[in-house]
Swiss-Prot record:
InterPro entries referenced in this protein's UniProt entry, alphabetically: P-loop_NTPase, RapZ-like, RapZ-like_N, RapZ_C
Keywords, ordered alphabetically: ATP-binding, GTP-binding, Nucleotide-binding
GO molecular function, one term: GTP binding
Family: Belongs to the RapZ-like family.
Binding site for ATP: 8-15
Name of the molecule in the record: Nucleotide-binding protein Sden_0486
Residues binding GTP: 56-59
Pfam families: PapZ_C, RapZ-like_N
Keyword Signal assigned: no
Length: 284
């Protein structure tokens, strides 16, 4: 089992780091009481071997000592990585002022600046224990995400899930699509009597559409579009991409195009899911 511990001063980007971990498949728990670490891992052992927790000033009581004790009790095969995120006092003050969020220690009679300084002192025991320190003072959300991925994976690239869905316009458009292509202008197998009862997954329909130059050109252009822009979509903190292909009834043209695109995108780098809505969720 792998355990990642994320700590740091409020406003330094812990929530961003947790989102990255969640996208990587980690079961994330924010502000877990430290004595519960062992119980959490034992409970998740059979269902999830990737776990991430955040530790912050809200469960402060002798954190460093308690954390050290809890980690010593974990099974020896547990792989532990830890991060401490920090920013300069000036940057943290600016971030809290801009977002108008309440600092966890501001409920007492102290100023925001005093709360920020006190939090830094309280978290010093944790900061001395961790493997990786990240100063986020000059980082934006995307740069911080890349750094976390780089440390965990050895690369800033992440596995983008591509969902390709065929549908029929007469049954309504899918609401979850990021990109939608209307292929109703392509030659329609519906008008071929012997092809009408078949679908775009059947060989006779595939052979019919494969003979159409317009079909080849469209597939090539869609593939080229995403090959060009996919790296930029991946760097934009995106975990999945949904591409919808629509024809009139969702039986022939859209099914064939979606099926062909799924095969072309399945190059090992991406997880590709093909769904044909009007065929009762049949997978390609």
């Amino acid at each position: 089992m792998k355990l990642v511990i994320v700590s740091g001063r409020s406003g330094s980007g812990k929530s961003v780091a947790l989102r990255v971990l969640e996208d990587l498949g980690y079961y994330c728990v924010d502000n877990l009481p430290l004595p519960l670490i062992g119980s959490l891992l034992a409970q998740l052992k059979s269902s999830n071997d990737l776990v991430a927790i955040s530790v912050d000033v809200r469960n402060i009581a002798e954190q460093g000592k308690v954390l050290e004790q809890q980690l010593a009790l974990l099974p020896p095969e547990t792989e532990i990585s830890s991060f401490f995120l920090n920013s300069s006092d000036k940057v943290l003050l600016k971030r809290f002022s801009e977002t108008r969020r309440l600092h966890p220690l501001s409920r007492s009679q102290m100023s925001l600046q005093e709360a920020i300084k006190l939090e830094g002192r309280l978290l010093e025991p944790i900061a001395k224990m961790v493997d990786h320190h990240i100063d986020t003072s000059l980082l934006n959300v995307y740069e911080l995400s890349d750094q976390v991925r780089q440390i965990l994976l050895g690369s800033v690239d992440k596995e983008l899930v591509i969902n390709i869905e065929s549908f029929g316009f007469k049954h309504g458009m899918p609401t979850e699509a990021d990109f939608m292509f209307d292929v109703r202008f392509l030659p329609n197998p519906h008008w071929e009597t012997e092809l009408r009862p078949l679908t775009g997954l059947d060989v006779p329909v595939q052979e019919f559409l494969a003979r159409q130059p317009l079909v080849h050109k469209l597939i090539w252009q869609i593939e080229n579009l995403f090959e060009t822009w996919m790296p930029h979509l991946e760097r934009n903190n995106r975990s999945y991409l949904t591409i919808a292909i629509g024809c009139t009834g969702g039986q022939h043209r859209s099914v064939y195009i979606a099926d062909q695109l799924a095969k072309r995108f399945a190059n090992g780098k991406h997880v590709v899911n093909a769904r044909h809505r009007e065929l009762g969720d049949v997978k390609a």
